[in-house]
């Protein structure tokens, strides 16, 4: 809510997996009611749910209909890769694991390792950079986070990116990892 995200969609396969995924759906609604009851009553927060296979299609056709998505691990693996592809691939998608009870958090790239291109100056650092942006926001360092976000947006608008993204940009200028990092630092 503090980030102006007022709709939560619980993505599940509860129609088939009634106890596990159906339980997740019930838990999600119960948690929202317990933690955000007043916001639900006032309409400030809307919680709905969607069967995962329908969500996969709808998210491609009408992404603007979704703001915050909560799902279980297996569905999340499919959903996160599909949605990352919509914005350039997993090389740009940030990730975070946050325990909202303790406040402990880990921010990380959403993808795994790529040993086949290690040391070749080909890696897109945007995922880990944007994960750091999320960390800065989480810590309340919003101005620093915004400076980095603005710098990345400037580069992407100019068509400056690593090869995995530049190939999709009109007049894209593909840079290696180090050169891209240097350009980002200059753009700050």
PLM regions: where:
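Short acidic loop-to-helix transition motifs that present clustered carboxylates
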Residues: 50-57
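Glycine-rich phosphate/diphosphate-binding loop of Rossmann-like nucleotide-binding domains
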Residues: 1-50
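Generic, well-ordered alpha-helical scaffold segments in large soluble proteins
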Residues: 27, 31-34, 135, 151, ...
